[in-house]
Amino acid sequence: MQSWIQPLSVLAWQRLGEYLHETQLLGSIQSTLYWDQNTRMPVAGAAWRGEQLSLLAKQLHARQSSSQFEGLLVEARAEFEQARLAGELEPIQVVEQARNLELLEQDLRRQQRLDPALVGELATAKSAGYARWQQARANADFSCFAPALQHLISLRQEQAQQLAEQRSCWESLAQPFEPDLTLARLKELFAPLRQRLPDLVEKARAWPRSRAVSLGWDLHETTQQGLCERLLQQWGRDLSITCVARSPHPFSITLGPQDFRLTTRVVPGQPLSCFLATAHEWGHSLYEQGLPDQSHQWFAWPLGQATSMAVHESQSLFWENRVARSRPFAEQWWPRFAQAGAPFTCAQDMWQAMNPISPGLNRVEADELSYGLHILIRTDLEIALLEKGLAVKDLPGEWNTRYGELLGVRPMNDAEGCLQDVHWSEGLFGYFPSYLLGHLISAQLSEAMTEAIGAPEDHVHRGDVMPLLDWLREHVHPLGRSVNAEQLVEKVSGRPLSTEAFLGYLESKLDRLHQASQPLQV
């Protein structure tokens, strides 16, 4: 158990903890309504749900920016300093308590800069935006969503101005997802990917498609669900604390210390989509379950929260790509899929089907090689929308042009294009780079894991993935917000974050897939 969860006394520190706990309860209610909106709520309930979420957002903001909260922080800081100077704390307690206070004070300042009216309006706009996005996506009609998107952009720009953090608009909005990230650093990290990924995609485009990928096949929804349930069981699912549902866009969410939810979706004609989405979202959930001290009393302390969304993505990508898409995994699972109706006659069939190299339109269904290009396009476009004057009405055309240039494909309609993701409908500008940063982090952490306990594929081959989870539980999950993403990577791997491990991994896997696609020489 982490030392920081022990209160310094029953006085200021305990009162602060009780206040944070009540704030977290409100946040949990808000998350529960979000879960319901995405999984079960009837479409006509959107307006009322918007009012509910707006009220909760204003109440949360009031608590997170109140003079009472500020006073509790001042008292807790004084109590901490007194105990530190008196030598009453262990060195680790000093470091961890100081970090908790630093993060709470930082979050308080950010909340105090925001107008409560703007907070409420944003909550309403996000709920309405999601409803409009659903309608627009179903009808492949961007014009239905455009006014809601413009409203969200205007509100987010106003939010960035109010925060006045000496950052650009996009940087300011990205901070909740990637603390301390700057555009300059993002451009530095993404530059080698912009240069190398298009060449790798073009190289792979000429390959012959594997038999399993070329065959048109599907599995019944209940069959897909059964395979997903079997996967989660093998990967240690505890039915008493987890719940799985369906939604238009897969996601994972934590509603409480013992309440972890995830969703998946069934895509007609893409029978592996549901399985891989489940693996991905379960990786998110495993990370949440492994964060420090998930108990009712301490759930809300900063050090018990996720480091960043890029670290979150690194964990989901590890389980999806390093485990579920691995050759040893296919060796174990292809008979189960074949028995369920898949046209697999050997492990290679399933492995190639799990790893198609075929640049397409959809980010969620993208292969590992072209995925980064999807993120580069979205990152550039949201920066253009927020900072460079790209008109909302021009977004579909600009989207289609960039897809043609980078991926060699063009959407037939808006649903295949700029309406495919939910993020902008919820005002989540600054989120998309976390996906690609997550790939970089996952690759570098996987190298560190390999050096420590052997390659992940070796453990998968032995049929025991628990050592992989144990290593992550020991070295990654417990860090919480004690560090930012880049500090975590350097602490665990011993090297600054770079693209080297990720590009090396892609090129190695590309070579193996290419060899597997060649006809046998007789």
Residue positions per predicted region:
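A well-structured
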Residues: 2-179, 507-519
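Contiguous, non-catalytic segments that form substrate-binding/exosite surfaces or channel walls
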Residues: 122-273
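Active-site recognition of the HExxH zinc-binding catalytic motif
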Residues: 273-292, 313-317
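Feature representing long, continuous alpha-helical segments
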Residues: 313-314, 375, 379, 383, ...
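Long, amphipathic alpha-helical stalk/connector segments used for oligomerization, subunit docking
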Residues: 325-426
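C-terminal substrate/ligand-recognition segments
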Residues: 370, 427-447, 499
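An amphipathic alpha-helical core segment
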Residues: 440, 444-453, 457-484
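C-terminal amphipathic alpha-helical interaction region
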Residues: 462, 473-517
